[in-house]
Amino acid sequence: MTNATDIGANDVEMEVDPTAETLADEKKNQDVAAVQEIREQIRQIEKGVASKESRFILRVLRNLPNTRRKLNGVVFRNLAQSIYPAGADREAAVALMPAVEKDATELPDVPKKQVATKAPIAEVDAYFYLLLLVKLIDASDLKRAGISADALMAKISIQNRRTLDLIGAKSYFYFSRVAELKNSLEGIRSFLHARLRTATLRNDFEGQAVLINCLLRNYLHYALYDQADKLVKKSVYPESASNNEWARFLYYLGRIKAAKLEYSDAHKHLVQALRKSPQHAAIGFRQTVQKLIIVVELLLGNIPERVVFRQAGLRQSLGAYFQLTQAVRLGNLKRFGDVVSQYGPKFQLDHTFTLIIRLRHNVIKTAIRSIGLSYSRISPQDIAKRLMLDSAEDAEFIVSKAIRDGVIEATLDPAQNFMRSKESTDIYSTREPQLAFHERISFCLNLHNQSVKAMRYPPKSYGKDLESAEERREREQQDLELAKEMAEDDEDGF
């Protein structure tokens, strides 16, 4: 019995050890595959530099989200041997690398044939530091990330190579991100302006787009809306920028317009930003834009549809805004105050608190409109009681302002001390239906124009090189005649 028990225990031990070894082997194989993948990306970058084709570099950068998940200290140490020759450059790179995990398995040494003997080209050097910066940000190692970002900017700033523009544009974004995490955005503003001037002079369109977005985010972080508006007016955003950069720019533009009380323009820009953003990714960005759209729609006097709050991935994050919408729709000042006090910190994090405070006037207008529809005559004291105002004089002032603004059609009778509502008129006898149709038609026309611009047509000179059907028939006829003549000449030769 004892022997059988010992044998069973040994079997259990034998089952545990292979599992641990298998996990270690899988981890090692993943690291080897990651190193090989990044080396292939480096070859693509070198190919793009040699052929002066940016599409190879663009293909590598598009794969950055997948690459960043595979990075670790072991991968970086193996790559450094094949990129940098032994010396100061390799030591500087190794000093910034993240620490190797305790359970990590070291990869075999790089073969002598693959060990670097000369310094890498500027594009490969910048790409390695970009990967290093991304990993340090993910690891929340802000001290090393700051040093790595400064080193990367120094490498990019001293170069004047068009093949470095795409990597530089991506680097500016993460450089600004590190400064934001370290709460030092103000310190990099002059550097970003200098790089924007350089990118504009060199026609670096992707760099221009990223730098303008970084500067707008910088200004909005400190609520400098006037400076952000001046930057938008004095700079030209490149049409060839990627969809992601356009989505960011339109979102920042919507925030600026909303802060400056231009709600119609703000709503238009925010809707465009939502359409240009990825439909099945970037959930955080879509949530942020949708929150601002809801607040702007409420400021415009519109009530968002209930289906907006039921979208997958947005339902939980929009819960506070659903309650806010309910309070505005009902014109309930008490409920509006409760929502603002309960979710105030959340609204401040979403950068919508200032706009939501402005909604108080909309809530009052909605309440007065509902009172005007419900009562033909009502005293200011009753209005103050319903709106929970301090005095009847406040209610009288608010009602007179609502009448002046056209919110309600009513008259105030100070002698008898009541508000008399006028009979409701037929809305189809006014210009409102015409204006609504005009807005819809304008939207359809703008959508059509944007769709046409998005299509790619061959240049006009392309058709000049193409022959018509008659020219083709004439050419074929000439070829046949020439072939007959050659055949006759051959026969004559015999």
Swiss-Prot record:
The keyword Magnesium does not apply. GO terms for molecular function: enzyme regulator activity; zinc ion binding. InterPro entries: 26S_Psome_reg_C (IPR013586), CSN3 (IPR050756), PCI_dom (IPR000717), WH_DNA-bd_sf (IPR036390). Residues 247-426 form the PCI domain. SUPFAM superfamilies: Winged helix' DNA-binding domain. The keyword DNA-binding does not apply. Keywords: Proteasome. GO terms for cellular component: cytosol; nucleoplasm; proteasome complex; proteasome regulatory particle; proteasome regulatory particle, lid subcomplex. GO terms for biological process: proteasome-mediated ubiquitin-dependent protein catabolic process; regulation of protein catabolic process; ubiquitin-dependent protein catabolic process. Disulfide bonds: none annotated. PROSITE patterns: PCI (PS50250). Blood (crystal) cells and cuticle. Residues 458-494 are annotated as: Disordered. It comes from the Eukaryota. Residues 462-486 have a biased composition (Basic and acidic residues). Acts as a regulatory subunit of the 26 proteasome which is involved in the ATP-dependent degradation of ubiquitinated proteins. Belongs to the proteasome subunit S3 family. The 26S proteasome is composed of a core protease, known as the 20S proteasome, capped at one or both ends by the 19S regulatory complex (RC). The RC is composed of at least 18 different subunits in two subcomplexes, the base and the lid, which form the portions proximal and distal to the 20S proteolytic core, respectively. This is Probable 26S proteasome non-ATPase regulatory subunit 3. The gene is Rpn3.
